[in-house]
Amino acid sequence: MDLSVKSQENVEHMVEAIKEKLRMVNAGAMKAANFDEDMYEDLRDIYDHVMKRETFSISEMQAITEELGTLMKK
């Protein structure tokens, strides 16, 4: 998958991978359709950061979740 290309398919892939990696409890609240492609680069930055790490503290998970929330369509 070429994540350098902006596409809804790539947004879906990144959102699902982030949810899985963080083992999000309320994952249903974060749907790929809720993310604007205009924020693709920011989402990609978060995705890259999350995929590099093995573990996250509670505060890191909270910060990532909050940042994802800012990228969601209003």
Curated annotation (Swiss-Prot):
InterPro entries: UPF0435 (IPR009507). It holds the Pfam family DUF1128. It comes from Bacillus cytotoxicus (strain DSM 22905 / CIP 110041 / 391-98 / NVH 391-98). This is UPF0435 protein Bcer98_0391. Belongs to the UPF0435 family.
